[in-house]
Every structure is written in C-alpha cells, then in structure tokens.
C-alpha cells in the first residue's frame, strides 16, 4: 500500500459517523500498526485534538479520497 503525507481517507464507522483522516507523518521506524500519523476529524469537522497513529491494516478499511 502506497501512502504519502497529505493523503486523505474516510473511515465509515459502525456508529454511522464518517471520520476524515489526513496523513501528516510517515515513520518507518515505528511499529507496523503505528507507521502513519494522522489528524482525524469527525463528520462535523471537529478535530480530535491529537495526532493518531495507524498502520496499513487500518487504512485498508478506509476509503481514499481524491482531495
């Protein structure tokens, strides 16, 4: 999976809320499940308040967006 800084994804959660994920950091020295740092916004545009870390396993569940 090719991920770049600036890529954006949408996670469609089971509770019906869509979360916007903006990749802000990629660190190959982190564990596989924490490789990508991202800002996360809820469906109302509210920022989660901290960078969250994900791996390819999570991003494969998300939809990559064009913008």
What are these regions (language model features)?
Residues 3-5, 26-28, 47, 62-65:
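N-terminal cationic leader/targeting segments used for protein routing and processing
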Residues 11-13, 30, 42:
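Acidic surface patches and DE-rich sequence motifs
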Residues 40-67:
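Intrinsically disordered, low-complexity, charged/polar segments
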Residues 33-38:
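Short aromatic-glycine-enriched beta-strand elements
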Residues 4-6, 24-25, 41, 52:
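N-terminal non-cleavable signal-anchor helices
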Residues 2-14:
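Short coil-to-beta transition motif at edge beta-strands of beta-rich domains
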């Amino acid at each position: 999976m090719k991920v770049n800084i600036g890529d954006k994804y949408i996670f469609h959660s089971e509770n019906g809320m869509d979360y916007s994920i903006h990749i802000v950091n990629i660190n190959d020295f982190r564990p596989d499940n924490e490789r990508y740092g991202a800002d996360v916004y809820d469906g109302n545009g509210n920022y989660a308040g901290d960078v969250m870390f994900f791996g390819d396993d999570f991003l494969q569940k998300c939809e990559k967006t064009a913008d």
